[in-house]
Amino acid sequence: YCLGKAFRDAEAGRRHNPEFTMLEWYRCDWDEHQLMGEVGELISQLYAAANALGLGRESPPLAIHKTSYTDCFEQVMGVNPHVAPLSDLQQLAVACSSDSWANESRANCLDLLFSQQVEPQLPKGLVLVYDYPACQSALAQVAINGDGHNVSRRFEAFLNGMELANGYFELRDPTEQQRRFDQDLKHRVEASRPAMPVDNKLLAALEQGLPSCAGVALGVDRLLMQLQGVDSITEVMPFSWERC
């Protein structure tokens, strides 16, 4: 595991700070569902401890919900994210954004719709969303779900509507990872976005062999926000972006 500082340029706001604290850990011979259970247990225990100490707002015991990406997306948007035509997703994206989405990829459209439309409708408590669309796999393996759709073997954890953690059943195939890097670079060029350098160290590590494992990254500052019942990330940091 690793507990330490992470940095992300060009993001500052109520839930974002360029410097933040991340807890990341891996479990060998586990899949994403086993790790998802451990994430739920960790957050539940911390939530109960915060309540017992009287931290933050008074709140009831933590409710835990598990749902597939398909179910929560269809419930809010009325379309299946795996089979809806890209043109339909682009039109839905335009409806909730002032920008043009005519040339955006399927992954970007789904990301916008989920963050702007679906996340605000998630139930209170801890929500664990799994089986994301295959186009959003990043570093995760892909499998076929019960409906015959390719899905990403990853999950995200949301506490009271705020994203806290992102986990993967880790991809181990260097050729497939190279293909994904190339595809992402192509989409960035087509969208006139800055090109990102390929992570050759990761590819070299995959060439050497990675054991079967699942990994997750959890935002500690956001978790503290929820445990203490505060509305801004600056309230749980000694030196936020504005005070540096």
Q: Where do the protein language model's features map onto the residues?
A:
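Short, glycine/acidic-rich hinge or "gate" loops at secondary-structure transitions
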Residues: N51-A63
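A common structural junction motif
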Residues: I43-A50
